Amino acid sequence: MNPTPPRSLVRRARRLVGACATVAVLAATASCSRGGDDAAETTPTTEPVATTEAPTTTRATTTTTSSTTTTAAPTTTTEKVIPRMPLTGVVLEEGQEPPDRPALVVKIDNNRVARPQSGLNEADIVFEEIVEYGTRFAAVFHSGDADPVGPIRSGRTQDIDLLGGLHQPLFAWSGGNPNVNRAIAESDFVDLHPAKFPGLYRRQGNRPRPHNFYSTTAELFAATPPDHTGRPTLLFAYVDPGERPGGRNVSRAEFAMDANRVLWEFSPEINGWLRATDGRSHHDELTGDRVSTTNVVILETGYRPSIA
């Protein structure tokens, strides 16, 4: 497979395909039949008789006709809505509700010194995006948590466009240059910049700076503003339970993202995908397991230098 410079989007959803919804519209037509009355015709017979002629009186007859119109009630077909986790598509059990909290984005380092990272397998969605000479992750949490999560690194202006559909997400990062700081502050993100929330972050472990900056999702979620409007909306369309997605079967996907080489291999044992980076198995430090996911989406797109 020839290497291409795509942006990889990793979705931790149980199922993820484009679904078509068919809406049936039933139209009811009412028809009316019109009937007529036959008038009886009488022919009088007159005989000449000797009589006194009585005065003739003419009486008017009025007939009232009533009309009844029947209108058929419209028929509506309502499609059953399957309740799901908004970012994974996992079907909820009866009476279960998604967590009443916003999406949380954590920018995670992918420098070789930063591996293995903490929290990639616990995220609902992980976006991998190109930065200078490598890649960086935007791990999105809603239904799961990670303690700790990191190493946390700086943001980019591309994060605003990439993550704009998450409905005012919390944005945890280590900061950026003045232009990026201003762009994030002016976006609809809830900016959890360390200068504003110094107590949320700490240096830990034996890695050199800047690859040792961590937090926990519990602490970051606790910084949600009291007037926040709540959980994210459903981000993708999913197949219904029991349906099979379309497409062609593949067992691996290998590609270049700037200086990084990324490999995803399908594993029948977990019925999902396992990751390798630069020829080595990629692990999550929290559990020691390989970084894995249920669905991998690879988007090939152009990159250009940011004005920030």
Show where each model-derived region lies.
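Residue-level detector of alpha-helical hydrophobic segments embedded in or interacting with membranes
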Residues: 1, 43, 50, 69, ...
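Generic low-polarity alpha-helical segments
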Residues: 1, 25, 64-66, 297-298
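Sec-dependent bacterial lipoprotein signal peptides
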Residues: 1-30
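Short linear motifs in intrinsically disordered/low-complexity regions
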Residues: 3, 38-42, 290, 296
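Hydrophobic multi-pass inner-membrane translocation pores used for secretion
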Residues: 9, 30-31, 46, 71
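Bacterial signal peptide processing site
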Residues: 32-36
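Extracellular mucin-like PTS domains
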Residues: 41-80
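A surface/extracellular/periplasmic glyco- and lipid-processing/surface-interacting theme
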Residues: 77-127, 132-308
